[in-house]
Curated annotation (Swiss-Prot):
The keyword Transferase applies. Glycans are attached at residues 58, 242. GO terms for cellular component: membrane. GO terms for molecular function: O-acyltransferase activity. It comes from Fusarium proliferatum (strain ET1) (Orchid endophyte fungus). It is an enzyme of class 2 (transferase). Pathway: Secondary metabolite biosynthesis; terpenoid biosynthesis. This is Acetyltransferase FUP5. Disruption phenotype: Leads to complete loss of fusaproliferin production and accumulates terpestacin. The gene is FUP5.
Length: 390
């Protein structure tokens, strides 16, 4: 079979640790030069190899935009060899930080690969915030493998229910999400979010089981955090993005957003201005590379709803912050009962606002979030119920 662009995605991701390793031997003011061969290689792949017939596979090539962003962050915006340190727990419960220049040659290579491919900063001093709870310290390998299998089964059940409902509502994918009436449209949109995140968590936990059981990677069980947090934490949109939705691509957006907030806007750290600046910039960047990736995979589609969703979201988050602050300071709403209202708000806001974005992914077949296996108990049960009624 002839090679196509998506076949080079893995190689493109490997450029990050290689460039970080080369950057350790390069003066900081010259590291940007390393981006030139990276850009040239990406252009060569784009012009020399065509897209294949699988639209979903073609969409994965769009991650080249994220890789380019991460490479720019590590080589230009940051000095990882001074700012990033491995963390190692000590016997007294504290953390020992290992700088890059204190390591031997082999450990420096491991450091570069670990840093480049660690999207959430687990085991590093720059860990992204806040991650779902990991197994307790002292958990044995056997107990961890058992917990992981339970997690995988739970996630698959959630995935099958959500994916089966989504497939059934869209009539085997023949109907777009936007073509549905309001209530089924909201349900279908929520099912897409739940189905897609569950698949990510399942794949991640299989990788964790391999790493822990073999002893090759991710061997510190107490740092093997799940990908997605509990849905009960979604009583605000902000908590949905910060705690429940996957954090795998947060790093690439967080670094330039902080640079803009602190160096350009000069907002005080932790202030409302800093938070909103980072929110607006991160969602804008995310929207642009989601749109560009989708446009490359399906050039005939406009994907304007994708851009609209990402540009609208920070405004809604700002409005949410202001309303919560007013309710707490002026109305004294601090009880736990208001979380029920918050869960309803998050469900309605997310499903209504993201319907166009989800339709942009489902209709062309970019990310359908349909059942991972051919046999879906949920889909079979729904079809059987309809046939029995008929």
């Amino acid at each position: 079979m002839p090679l196509e662009r998506a076949d080079f995605v893995g190689a493109i991701w490997l450029t990050t640790p290689i460039l970080v390793l080369l950057g350790s031997k390069t003066p900081r003011h010259l590291r940007w030069i390393l981006l030139l061969p990276f850009g040239g290689s990406c252009l060569l792949v784009a012009f020399a190899f065509p897209f294949g017939p699988d639209v979903a596979k073609n969409y994965t090539f769009g991650t080249v935009f994220y890789v380019a962003l991460v490479n720019f962050n590590l080589l230009v915006l940051e000095d990882p060899y001074l700012e990033h340190k491995w963390t190692q727990p000590t016997s007294d419960g504290k953390e020992h930080q290992q700088p890059f220049h204190s390591l031997g040659a082999w450990d420096r290579i491991r450091w570069c690969f670990d840093n480049a491919l660690s999207t959430r900063g687990i085991g590093w001093n720059w860990r992204t915030a806040p991650l779902p709870s990991a197994p307790a310290p002292g958990t044995s390998k056997t107990a961890f493998l058992r917990l992981s299998m339970q997690r995988i089964l739970q996630q698959y059940m959630g995935h099958d229910i959500a994916a089966g409902i989504l497939l059934w509502l869209t009539h085997d994918g023949k109907m777009g999400v936007l073509e549905l009436d309001f209530v089924p449209r909201c349900i279908a949109t929520a099912c897409w979010w739940a189905s897609s995140i569950a698949v990510m968590d399942i794949g991640y936990h299989f990788a964790c089981m391999i790493g822990v059981s073999s002893g090759l990677f991710w061997t510190r069980i107490e740092e093997v955090h799940p990908v997605n947090g509990p849905w009960a934490e979604c009583y605000t949109l902000s908590r949905f993005w910060n705690r429940t939705w996957h954090q795998n691509f947060r790093r690439g957006l967080q670094i330039p957003s902080r640079v803009v907030a602190r160096r350009v806007v000069r907002a005080p750290r932790g202030s409302m201005l800093s938070r909103q600046t980072q929110s607006y910039f991160a969602f804008t960047l995310s929207g642009l590379y989601h749109w560009a990736a989708a446009k490359m995979a399906a050039p005939s589609e406009s994907f304007t709803r994708t851009l609209t969703f990402f540009l609208l979201m920070p405004n809604i988050l700002l409005l949410e912050d202001l309303v919560i602050r007013f309710a707490q300071e002026k109305l004294g709403w601090r009880g736990s009962w208001w979380r029920v209202v918050g869960l309803v708000w998050t469900f309605l806001a997310l499903t209504i606002l993201s319907t166009g974005f989800v339709n942009d992914l489902v209709a062309p077949g970019l990310v359908t979030a349909f059942p991972a296996l051919r046999m879906s108990p949920t889909y079979y049960m729904l079809n059987t119920m309809v046939e029995n009624r008929g």
